[in-house]
Structures are given as structure tokens and as C-alpha cells.
Amino acid sequence: MSYNNNSDSYGGGYNSYGGNSYGGGGYGGGRGGGRGGFGGRGGGRYDERVELNTPEWDIDSLPKFEKNFYNEHPDVTARSVQDVNAFRKEHDMKCDGTDIPKPITSFDEAGFPDYVLKEVKQQGFPKPTSIQCQGWPMALSGRDMVGIASTGSGKTLSYCLPSIVHINAQPLLSPGDGPIVLVLAPTRELAVQIQQECSKFGSSSRIRNTCVYGGAPKGQQIRDLARGVEICIATPGRLIDMLETGKTNLRRVTYLVLDEADRMLDMGFEPQIRKIVDQIRPDRQTLMWSATWPKEVQALTRDYLNDPIQVTVGSLELAASHTITQLVEVVTEFEKRDRLIKHLETATADPEAKCLIFASTKRTCDEITNYLRADGWPALAIHGDKQQGERDWVLKEFKTGKSPIMVATDVAARGIDVKGISYVINLDMPGNIEDYVHRIGRTGRAGSTGTAVSFFTDNNSKLGGDLCKIMREANQTIPPELMRFDRRSFGSHIRYGRGGGRGGFRGGRGRGGFRGGRGGYQSGSNSAPLGNARRY
């Protein structure tokens, strides 16, 4: 696929974007309205899978597009270098690169058009978050950028709102065009949440979007892409499937977002990311967002971002939010059940509280959910063996508070952003300290406080040193029992008994099929009867 033909243009023409293979026609309901329906497709089998080769780009022949929309507010212009440095220091913000825009301090200073500003103010946000104060001017200026900030810091709106401005400045989609904005995310849950934000703030501009992810039927996703969408939020694997089978293309993408880039690389998506990005014109605007700054993310930045500017809120060192109270209990496997119940009783003293419990395996997820439900706790499980419909239902029940306790594995919980989670309980510790920080970051978001309880066993001894370091940085109280593991991790020869074996939770393993039940989605542990020993 090459774009060396000077006749290429947006809409119309033999080699145009939206050209002959779709046979004319159009679609309605989007920006500019009524264009009728899609015409017939051109030759060839639509379902044939085609290997994605890297195009030979000729920048001079590509249609021009606008990407700099930033008009600095007079109040921002008037700020001195000393004022800017003081603001960044106050917000623990560091910037790297050349010609970096000054941060803004209010929504009015951001320079958004009225139709965007109206949507923001209707949501009742008091002021921009730290990452938004610097990220919005960067994104609106059309620069390639890297944003590094902890989860729950407002990163989604940092790229979502500028994308709406970007879309409205581009020519309308023609039949056969792919999206203008592409957002890559590591998990289906995060992709769905990004879509919700895009829908919320893009509705007034009639900007259409779709969410393309695995584990769900392709039919609706294909229909959305065929009708035409300005924004596509996708997980890498499913998007490549859509590209290879000709269900969409990336020829119109001029605004690319890599969200939770570190997580995507952790999950092994680097080859897919590179294959996808190679399909997009190189003069696009690229925005990379990450919670950490490992060397793998740095390499991706060097390869795909052009003269980027970077904002980091907080330390590049791995750290937990200081709004989270971390409680670590050194226990045996046999003690976990009783300790869990005690903390649930504390957590649910607040009737509005939500509690997220992490388990290491899908089996443990189901077993503890069965146990809790039998004891009268309204718990539901979410993990990779649950079908997408059930996962969506569980998440909805948890968000609305109908089932305020959710038991999850790491993979299933990645990208989940639920407001009001007051307690996170690590029933099983994760395998590394990065996942620990990511887990407990589900609470204490956007300035609110939260509590994270972790059950630490002798089997987790390798995490002892890193865990103590994270707790010290956040000014947390480290129990003496845990400090012994800290010394051991730094070479102490002190030995401690292993404690009483693995033990664990026993209960029904059967996953079963879907049952009718409430909402028609429950399977296995989620369909276990709820005991009457609790106030629920």
C-alpha cells in the first residue's frame, strides 16, 4: 500500500480516501448529516485476510491536515517563567523538550471552543487536574507528546477533549474512510471506559465512535466501522484482525493515542502496536500516556514520536498515591479467610462503600466468591473465563453498588476505573511490585482517600524489600513482621518458619453455563445463592 499518487484526496476519485472499493454511497447521522447508506463493495472477497505490509509513505502527496489549535490565553501569556516554574513545582510536575507550552490553571484558560467548554462545565468538574493543566496545551498545540502520571489522574480527558477539537477541524469522512482518531488500550474494560468518555463529550458535535476489542462478537463492531466513525478505541489484537480482513483502514488517522503504554507492553502487545502504527501516516500527531517510564516505553517513543515534549506528574520512581492508607498483614494462607471477613465488616460499615478484592487465579476468584455469597456477602467475580456479557454485567452491578464487592484477577481488572472504591484487598499478593501499585491505585483516586489491605505470606518474601520501599515513600506504617522480610531481601541470613502451608479457600469450582437469573448473565460463582447471614 503506497500513497505516491498525487491524485489522492479526501473523498471521491479513483485513488481517494473512501475510493472505489466501496462503490460509492455514504452514511448518515454523523457530522454534516444525511448522506444515505453505503453502496456496494468493489471486487474481491471482503473476508479475505491480507498481510499488513508497511506502506511506502510519500508525505508530499498526502492530503494536508491541521493539528495546531492552541491559542494561548492572555492570562497564561502574562505569566512569568518564575510563575510557571512555581506552578509546576507546586504540582510536582516536570517537563522535558523544546518550546513547551505554559500550563493553564482553569478550564477557561485551556482555549477549548465553546462547545467543548460547555460539556466540561456541565460535568461539574471544579478545576483541571495537574496532568490536564499541562497536557491540554501540549495536545492542542499539535505536538507529539508523552504524559506520565498515576492512574486516576485525569489522563483520559487529557487526550479526549483535544481529539474532539482535532476531529472538527478535519474534512468529513467519506464512504470507506477509517477513523480520524485511534486510541489503543490494553484491555477491553479500559477501552469501554474510554468510549464512555468520548461519547459523553463528543455528543454535541455528533462525533461517532466505536469500541473494538476481543472477547465479544465482531458483528456490531464491523457494522460500526462500516457506517463510519471518527473515533475508534481498540485493543491491539482485535484491531489487527479488523485491518487484515479489510473491515477498516487507518488511512485517515491523524491523531493517535497509546493509552497505558506500559501495560500494553507488559502484556506483550509490542509487535501488534508496531504493526498498527506502521499503517498510519508518519506526520500524524501521536500522544503516549503511561503510568511508568520503563526502557521499553522509551524505545517506543524514540521510534514513533517526532520531537516529543513530555510532562511527568509525580516521580518517575514507582510510587503509590499518598491518599491511600496501606495496611499489610503478615499471615498464613489459613488465616486469610477470617482476616478478609474482618476487613469486609469494617469496609461495609459505610453503606456506600465499594470493595475490590484481588485474587491470583481464576479458580481462587470463583472459590472466594462462592464462599462470600454463601456467607451473605453480595460478591461477584470477574476474570478471563467469564464471557464478555457477564463481565459487563458484573462491572455494572459493581459500579451501581448493587453488588458492592467484586473479586477479580489482575488481567480482568486492568483498566477498570470505578468511582467510589474505598477498599482494595489483596487476598493474594501480586507477582511484582508494579502490579501492587497498580492494584491499590484503584482506590484513593482524584484526590479522594482509600484503604488498601494486603495479606502477605512467606511465599511473598521476594516482594518484601520493594513493598517496604513503596510504603516508606508514602509515609506508611510498616509492621515489624514485614520489616523482617525487608532485611531478608537485602541479604540477611535470619530464617523464619514458613507458617502453615497453602490452605486456601475451598468451594464450588464449576463454572457452569449462563443462567437466566437477574440480568441473564450469571455463571458459576456469580450464580451461587446469597446467604442470609448478612444485612444484604
From Swiss-Prot:
Subcellular location: Cytoplasm; Nucleus
Catalyzed reactions: ATP + H2O = ADP + phosphate + H(+)
Helicase C-terminal domain span: 326-486
Keyword Iron-sulfur: no
CC terms in the record's Gene Ontology section: cytoplasm; nucleus
Binding site for ATP: 149-156
Signal peptide location: none
Region feature (RNA-binding RGG-box): 496-520
SUPFAM superfamilies: P-loop containing nucleoside triphosphate hydrolases
Entry keyword Magnesium: no
Motif DEAD box: where in chain: 259-262
Keyword annotations of the record: ATP-binding, Cytoplasm, Helicase, Hydrolase, Nonsense-mediated mRNA decay, Nucleotide-binding, Nucleus, Ribosome biogenesis, RNA-binding, rRNA processing
Residue ranges annotated as motif Q motif: 105-133
Subunit structure, as described in the record: Associates with polysomes.
Domain-related comment: The Q motif is unique to and characteristic of the DEAD box family of RNA helicases and controls ATP binding and hydrolysis.
UniProt-recorded name of the protein: ATP-dependent RNA helicase DBP2
Organism: Debaryomyces hansenii (strain ATCC 36239 / CBS 767 / BCRC 21394 / JCM 1990 / NBRC 0083 / IGC 2968)
